[in-house]
Amino acid sequence: MEDILGEWKRSHYCGNLTKADVGREVILMGWILRRRDHGGLIFADLRDREGLAQIVFDPAKNTDAHHKAEAIRNEYVVAVKGEVIPRPEGTVNSAMKTGEVEVLVTECKILNRSKALPFTLDDYVDVAENIRLKYRYLDLRRPVLQQNLILRSMVAQITRQYLSENGFLEIETPFLTKSTPEGARDFLVPSRINQGNFYALPQSPQIFKQILMISGFDRYFQIVRCFRDEDLRADRQPEFTQIDCEMSFIDREDIISVMEGLIAKIFTVAKGVDVPLPMPRMTYAEAIRRFGVDNPDVRFGLELVELTDIVKGAGFKVFADVAASGGIIKGLNAKGCARFSRKEIDDLTEFAKIYGAKGLAYVKIEEGQWHSPIAKFFSAEEIATMNQAFGAEDGDLLLFVADKPKVVNDSLGKLRNHLAGILGLADKNTFRFVWITDFPLLEWDEDEKRWAAVHHPFTAPMDEDLEKVESDPGSCRAKAYDLVLNGNEIGGGSIRIHQQHVQSLMFSMLGLSDDETRAKFGFLLDALECGTPPHGGIAFGMDRLIMLLTGSDSIRDVIAFPKTQKGACLMSEAPSPVDAKQLRELALKVTVKQ
């Protein structure tokens, strides 16, 4: 029979006891992590969200409490009353925040019992993720996940305080909205009242926050849930959280300045890390040239080296043919990696092939000489020129890819990050930010044979590029900007189109007919004709930001109830079938693909 809490009130969290509390009577409540019977004295670690406290049951002090302790098992919920005392000499546990003190229990209440658990709730016990997700209510008791979610809550509070102090209004936008093409698939919600019609869960509040600017709210923010029905990976979820912001009567510099202040405050308060401001910037073109990707990790070097002009006239036919057909040749210098075995180099080659490379040429530099199957195709002068371009020294490993520009940049850019992981160059406790600016406005979709928006259809072109959107769309740049942290895009934004004729032109460039545009975006086009101010904004991926702040390997470790990579909640068993009555009310019939 469990005890009743009665009039007991918790006086302290377990993890907050210090030497300053010695001599005080305290009431603690929590879960028993472990119990140890020393043949008289019984010790237990009591856990709550703030940490652990060691509690001691001494039969010489209180037989009733000691009798209760004999019945206690792991994960029992208990409340104890007792005196905080210093630990005896030689028993101080410096690994515990409360390791200098313990609580000598005078009264104990067993509030609830626990059956044997499927896994131990110690952080250091390795448990398969599917088991952890099935028993998420247990997994969330583990200190590492509790600390992750406590930090997440802190970041939300810092965000609200900072943005409110800077004149932003927190305004909610609808979850049940209209399906519009924004890149990924929508989650659709059937309407019972308007049968045959569907709502869509928002992929972002993009259009609504722009309409709020048209409505005169000037500065908006929201910590908002968004939904995308897309294939998942370690840093993606079907439902995710954004710190969403929009501002009127501003330019790019205004947005960047305010948002740098937000990120700096988050890192200072939540992590104790000072972020130098202003943050570095580079254009999209520079990022691709130097790093091969538009989200470069600038914690380390390994920059790509452009070699096309050096090798296009050389005797190595593979390189010469690629250059002659409009391709490029780039390389990177893996400093000190000439020690890599042939198998290790083969593994790097296979990795590069994942991103389209047909192969990976390599050169080991030892005793001032090139050691490579391709060395014989280059003159001493060409080798010297390449060595200079690479900054090559004895012990280095030079890696080359020759192909179409996109393949070269993708494969070497990803290989660069892969090598940094192998070489231990990417320290999780080092934080390096960079803004990427001047993105292309449009990119050609080879599969659909049409232009597609690089960011989204509401991004404004650079003023000087507006006149060539129709005549030369591939050369137009966008007023777009991403914030990248340690190779992860944590925020993306842009100045928006605020003139109706420009927005109509953009929809036309994306292949939408006038009828399609009116059907999908008519309300926005009408609003744009009613006095729309210049405006822009940004959205930060909160899940990814918290993942980086905590050093977690997956955003599933910073979300209370995440989905698997198949979009399932193993705990609640969602998604699940619904009964026939619900389907009839919605005028729906389910057919299953064979």
Curated annotation (Swiss-Prot):
Q: Say which family it is in.
A: Belongs to the class-II aminoacyl-tRNA synthetase family. Type 1 subfamily.
Q: Which HAMAP family match?
A: Asp_tRNA_synth_type1 (MF_00044)
**Per its record, what are the GO molecular function terms?**
aspartate-tRNA ligase activity; aspartate-tRNA(Asn) ligase activity; ATP binding; nucleic acid binding
Q: Where are the disulfide bridges?
A: none
Q: Where is this region: Aspartate?
A: 206-209
Q: What is its EC number?
A: 6.1.1.23
UniProt superkingdom:
Bacteria
PANTHER family found in the cross-reference section: ASPARTATE--TRNA LIGASE, MITOCHONDRIAL, ASPARTYL/LYSYL-TRNA SYNTHETASE
Q: Where in the cell is it found?
A: Cytoplasm
Alphabetized InterPro entries for the sequence: Aa-tRNA-synt_II (IPR004364), aa-tRNA-synth_II (IPR006195), aa-tRNA-synth_II/BPL/LPL (IPR045864), Asp-tRNA-ligase_1 (IPR004524), Asp-tRNA-ligase_1_N (IPR047089), Asp/Asn-tRNA-synth_IIb (IPR002312), AspRS_core (IPR047090), GAD-like_sf (IPR004115)
SUPFAM superfamilies tied to this protein: Class II aaRS and biotin synthetases, GAD domain-like, Nucleic acid-binding proteins
Which residues are tagged with the site Important for tRNA non-discrimination? H38, G90
- Please describe the quaternary structure of this protein: Homodimer.
Please name the source species: Geobacter metallireducens (strain ATCC 53774 / DSM 7210 / GS-15)
Question: What is any Pfam family matched here?
Answer: tRNA-synt_2
Reaction(s) catalysed by this chain, per the record, are: tRNA(Asx) + L-aspartate + ATP = L-aspartyl-tRNA(Asx) + AMP + diphosphate
Return the GO cellular component terms, semicolon-separated: cytoplasm
Biological role stated in the UniProt entry:
Aspartyl-tRNA synthetase with relaxed tRNA specificity since it is able to aspartylate not only its cognate tRNA(Asp) but also tRNA(Asn). Reaction proceeds in two steps: L-aspartate is first activated by ATP to form Asp-AMP and then transferred to the acceptor end of tRNA(Asp/Asn).
Q: For L-aspartate, which residues are the binding ones?
A: E182, R228, H455, R496
Any idea which positions bind ATP? R228, D229, E230, Q237, E489, G541, M542, D543, R544
Q: Does the keyword ATP-binding apply?
A: yes
Q: Which CDD domains match?
A: AspRS_core, EcAspRS_like_N
Q: What is the protein's name according to its record?
A: Aspartate--tRNA(Asp/Asn) ligase
Q: Which GO terms describe its biological process?
A: aspartyl-tRNA aminoacylation
Q: Does the keyword Repeat apply?
A: no
